């Protein structure tokens, strides 16, 4: 056992425990990416321009809080370590605010907008408070780089599993739990997600351990750290690239439900083994997003080999271009070309899915 600890070999149970943290997080992140616009315009009922501004403001604010939270977490000292405690301390507030975010209050428009700004920015702050330390935990879970790579792979598998769960089940679940009341369905769905998230975060907290101690270095202030970041050109380039990528993912995902609801509508489709059936926009959207998640997972597997041969930067640029073109081409298709729409989704997701992996690896 001492030899195992010395070389940093982790049990499979601990590797799985870490992955549960991303399973919890992506239930929310994938919802924001796929259904943000639809929820706020068609369920919450605020103007699209207000919803778009809300998203933009929160993204800019999030870029600031991410940096600050990283500095705070790095200075945290507890008996549980630097990073694990945040999973314990904030999982319940995160779940509660998640329910409030997807609650539609009986307010006038101004009151609704205030509610939306407060709750959405608060859920994003809590997301940052949990996920910045959670991501950093990967670096201290083992001194063995091969073990950390394995844990990272499991983390991405859990993330894509959560993406598939959201894509396949969220819209049907809101219908089922709402009993005809769409707003109530969203609120109850996030009660379910919230309970699941608490359990998953606690599994990640309980099942992992911080083993790599940070070296004692000269203490610096947050102000000094920020000054060094601002003058760091590679960091600035990576930040702009990350913002561009997130905006692409957000726009691509957020218009999907509206596209199927108002452009595609209900379709009669002939499928092998299922015959000819009629599908409404909820089923088509869920199928479209699920196909995208599976394609993204396959893309992540493929890019791990391609990046070694052609380079991470080259593959990122190539895949980003293909993803953008595949997404743009959908505009030129009609509702009757549903098969081609799904094929472009496969191409766009196969190349778009691995972008986050390549981005973090550069």
Residue ranges and their predicted role:
Residues 2-362:
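Membrane-embedded alpha-helical bundles of multi-pass transporters/translocases
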């Amino acid at each position: 056992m001492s030899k195992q600890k010395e070389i940093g070999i982790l049990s499979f149970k601990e590797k799985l425990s870490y992955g549960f943290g991303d399973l919890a997080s992506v239930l929310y992140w994938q919802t924001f990416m796929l259904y943000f616009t639809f929820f706020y315009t068609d369920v919450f009922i605020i103007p699209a321009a207000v919803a778009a501004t809300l998203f933009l403001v929160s993204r800019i604010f999030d870029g600031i809080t991410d940096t600050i939270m990283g500095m705070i977490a790095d200075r945290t000292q507890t008996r549980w370590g630097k990073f694990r405690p945040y999973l314990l301390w904030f999982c319940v507030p995160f779940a509660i605010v998640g329910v409030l975010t997807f609650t539609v209050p009986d307010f006038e428009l101004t009151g609704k907008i205030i509610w939306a700004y407060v709750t959405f920015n608060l859920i994003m702050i809590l997301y940052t408070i949990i996920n910045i330390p959670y991501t950093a935990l990967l670096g201290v879970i083992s001194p063995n780089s091969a073990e950390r790579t394995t844990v990272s792979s499991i983390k991405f598998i859990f993330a894509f599993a959560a993406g598939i769960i959201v894509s396949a089940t969220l819209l049907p679940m809101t219908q089922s739990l709402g009993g005809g009341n769409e707003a109530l369905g969203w609120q109850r769905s996030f009660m379910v997600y919230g309970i699941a998230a608490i359990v998953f975060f606690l599994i990640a907290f309980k099942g992992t351990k911080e083993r790599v101690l940070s070296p004692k270095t000269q203490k610096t202030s947050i102000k000094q750290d920020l000054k060094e970041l601002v003058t760091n050109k590679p960091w600035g380039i990576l930040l702009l690239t990350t913002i561009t990528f997130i905006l692409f993912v957000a726009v691509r995902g957020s218009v999907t439900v509206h596209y199927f609801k108002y452009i595609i509508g209900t379709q009669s489709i002939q499928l092998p083994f299922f015959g000819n059936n009629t599908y409404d926009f909820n089923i088509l959207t869920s199928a479209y997003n699920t196909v995208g998640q599976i394609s993204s997972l396959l893309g992540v597997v493929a890019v791990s080999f391609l990046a070694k041969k052609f380079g991470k930067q080259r593959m990122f640029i190539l895949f980003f271009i293909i993803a953008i073109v595949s997404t743009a081409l959908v505009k030129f298709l009609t509702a009757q070309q549903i098969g081609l729409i799904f094929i472009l989704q496969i191409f766009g997701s196969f190349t778009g899915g691995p972008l986050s992996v390549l981005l973090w690896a550069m």
